[in-house]
Amino acid sequence: MSKLKTRSSAAKRFKVTATGKILHKKAGKRHNLSKKSESRKRRLDIPGEIKSVDRWKVERMLPYNL
């Protein structure tokens, strides 16, 4: 059987932790930051965990990271 390819777009966007969680960056931290509060900007720094309904899709795109 041939090797499975990793989706490079998914590899750039998601990070798999040692415990198996799949994390992503939160949207809204690129521009127009002056109108956002400091606490909101800090909250956007914390990575989010993907939803369970989307997990199988990401797992198929990252075959060797899990």
Swiss-Prot record:
Spans annotated as Disordered: 1-43
PROSITE patterns on file: RIBOSOMAL_L35 (PS00936)
Annotated Gene Ontology cellular component terms: cytosolic large ribosomal subunit
Compositional bias segments (type: Basic residues): 1-15, 22-43
Matching InterPro entries: Ribosomal_bL35 (IPR001706), Ribosomal_bL35-like (IPR021137), Ribosomal_bL35_CS (IPR018265), Ribosomal_bL35_sf (IPR037229)
MF annotations from Gene Ontology: structural constituent of ribosome
Keyword entries, A-Z: Ribonucleoprotein, Ribosomal protein
One GO BP: translation
Similarity remark: Belongs to the bacterial ribosomal protein bL35 family.
Protein name per Swiss-Prot or TrEMBL: Large ribosomal subunit protein bL35
